[in-house]
C-alpha cells in the first residue's frame, strides 16, 4: 500500500482541527500508521523545506512552522497521495473547493492548516525525515475487506 506524510500545521493545531483531519481520513478508509505531536526543530524544518530555503518567503514560512506544535502523521492506503491532495485542497485556500480541508478551514496561503506530500517520492522523503522505520506500525483495519476490491 502507498503511504503519505501529512502534517497539521501550527494554525490547525491552535484551532483544534487535528481531530477533524484524522476523522476525514479515517472515514475515507485510510489508516494512520504513525503520528507524533511536536514543535519541529530548526534542522528538520530546513531538511523538510530544503527546496524552499533560498526563496524569499522561506524566513516567514520557517517562523510560522516553528511558531507552535505540529501534528505529524503517516497514512496508508490505495492511491493515498493523490486522494489526500484532493481532500486537502489547493495550496491557496482562495482556490480550494468547499468540502476540502483548506476550502472549509483556511483563508490565507501562509496559514493553510495542513501539509500533504505531493508525490510518492516526496512522501517517502518526508516520512524518512520525520519518522524512523520502526515508528511505522503495520496492521490490518477490520473493515479493509469492505474498502478494497
From Swiss-Prot:
Annotated ATP binding sites: 9, 57, 85, 91, 102, 112
Protein name: Nucleoside diphosphate kinase
InterPro entries: NDK-like_dom, NDK-like_dom_sf, Nucleoside_diP_kinase, Nucleoside_diP_kinase_AS
One Gene Ontology cellular component: cytoplasm
CDD domains cross-referenced by the UniProt entry: NDPk_I
EC number: 2.7.4.6
Reaction equations catalysed: a 2'-deoxyribonucleoside 5'-diphosphate + ATP = a 2'-deoxyribonucleoside 5'-triphosphate + ADP; a ribonucleoside 5'-diphosphate + ATP = a ribonucleoside 5'-triphosphate + ADP
